[in-house]
């Protein structure tokens, strides 16, 4: 029930955001009519949509299909709102912080930032906030967005999502699982494994892999499968789940594989039974609502979320509901 309530709240916020977009556009358009008279002490009229640029800066690695969906959501929001959206990414926190600083120097109107390594981005994000630039964090960073001065965070509670995965593994009847972390130092991924360990009734060991080298990661996973007691794998990303499935096939083992995050291949693998489940945080929602929330703050002073995060997940994808998800995944929106 807790997960359903969180998802219902997230959908409710999303509906309010989209409804507010229409109101915000009307307010922006009407601002020109109220500029005269004796109200010289009022703040300047809000910017018109066509004059707004929002920069999305993520920690995505090159070729990561998950972030292609986030980018698509952000760009669709830009199209729907009639604003410019710039997208840049770098998995190195030092370089990501430079991208944030560069956006500020180039007079961005707002920022949407993922925080896989909050400590590495703290200075840049706080500097943006101090300079009056509205910031919303997405995906990673749910424990730090308030301290950094962001409006809200759009994503899932990673520990809660991990707990959900642990329960799914219990339902699958496995006893000895490896949790594959594909990005070193990513606090969200560490939280997923920690959450899964909390609810999983068996034993679980973390395994470090590399999402930028899936072939090597497959070999790393396959080597762990030489231990005959390992009967489950929890992948933390869609691309890594593919490497896990291939490792199981190559090892000739009967091993249950579950994953976080959804793409077209993941949806198909759930349908054909190669994956037992997928935990979906809906990355398209993160990109779309991140941009929309910043836009609303710029044109109408709205603070989306009311001081709380906006939950985009977790949702559980199984064979029972994967067919519908697969249709959207083929479009690059799930």
Task: Tell what function each PLM region has.
Residues 97, 113-130, 196, 211-268:
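Hydrophobic alpha-helical
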Residues 119, 123-160, 263-271, 275-276, ...:
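Flexible loop/hinge segments that line or gate small-molecule binding clefts
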């Amino acid at each position: 029930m807790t997960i359903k309530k969180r998802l219902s709240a997230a959908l409710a916020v999303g509906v309010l955001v989209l409804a507010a977009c229409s109101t915000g556009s009307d307010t922006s358009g009407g601002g020109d009519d109220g500029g005269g008279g004796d109200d010289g002490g009022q703040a300047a009229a809000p910017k018109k949509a066509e004059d707004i640029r929002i920069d999305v800066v993520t920690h995505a690695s090159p070729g990561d299909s998950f972030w292609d969906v986030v980018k698509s959501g952000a760009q669709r929001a830009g199209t729907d709102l009639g604003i410019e959206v710039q997208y840049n990414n770098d998995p190195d926190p030092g370089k990501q912080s430079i991208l944030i600083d560069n956006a500020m120097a180039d007079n961005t109107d707002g920022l949407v930032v993922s925080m896989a390594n909050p400590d590495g981005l703290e200075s840049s994000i706080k500097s943006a906030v101090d300079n009056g630039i509205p910031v919303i964090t997405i995906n990673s960073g749910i424990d730090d967005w308030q301290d950094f001065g962001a409006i809200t965070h759009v994503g899932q509670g990673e520990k809660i999502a991990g707990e959900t995965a642990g329960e799914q593994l219990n339902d699958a009847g496995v006893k000895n699982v490896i949790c594959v972390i594909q990005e070193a130092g990513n606090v969200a991924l560490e939280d997923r494994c920690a959450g899964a360990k909390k609810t999983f009734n068996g034993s679980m060991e973390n395994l470090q892999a590399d999402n930028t080298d899936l072939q090597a990661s497959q070999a790393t996973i396959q080597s762990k499968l030489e231990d005959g007691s390992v009967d489950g794998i929890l992948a933390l990303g869609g691309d890594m789940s593919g490497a896990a499935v291939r490792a199981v096939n190559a090892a000739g083992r009967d091993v249950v594989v579950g994953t976080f995050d959804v793409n077209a291949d993941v949806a198909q693998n759930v349908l054909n039974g190669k994956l037992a489940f997928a935990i979906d945080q809906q990355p398209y929602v993160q990109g779309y609502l991140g941009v929309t929330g910043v836009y609303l703050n710029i044109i109408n002073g709205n603070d989306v979320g009311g001081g709380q995060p906006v939950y985009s997940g977790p949702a559980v994808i199984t064979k029972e509901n994967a067919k519908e998800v697969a249709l959207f995944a083929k479009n690059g929106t799930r």
